[in-house]
Amino acid sequence: RHQSDWLAVISLDLETYVASVVGAEMPSRWHREALKAQAVAARSYALAHLARPATTSYHLGDTTRWQVFSGETSTTTASRAATLETRGMILSYGGGIVESLYASNDQVSAEAHGHLGASMSQTGAQQLASQGLPFNAILGRYYRGASLARLKRYDQ
């Protein structure tokens, strides 16, 4: 129970979670590189919240307050591919995992996260991908100073 209501909490594999978030946060018809940038941002955000859970009951919610998560209903072929192609990749800064904030567009990104200095615009990522930028360059535009890293459990 959470306060006076029952609360369902799901525990699942990170990559399954990321594929659902990508499918819920971006249209599947968007450029593959934008979807890959979203996958890395979503994975990094989720892992950053393992260290700082939303509540004592769960790490992340499933709404735009955190990341939209709809389970299998939002997972698409495109979101699975973007997740697989970036499997285990995160954003790192100073040896830690970046809480890679993002929002739907530049204005919302600036209003919601501008004081933090690093937040990806999803429509901006789509525009950059359409101009030919790969996902790592897109992430570099929004998360200055951060670098791509691979989680040790994915190293082979």
Q: Regions from the language model: what does each represent?
A:
Residues 1-156:
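Conserved, single-site charged/polar hotspot
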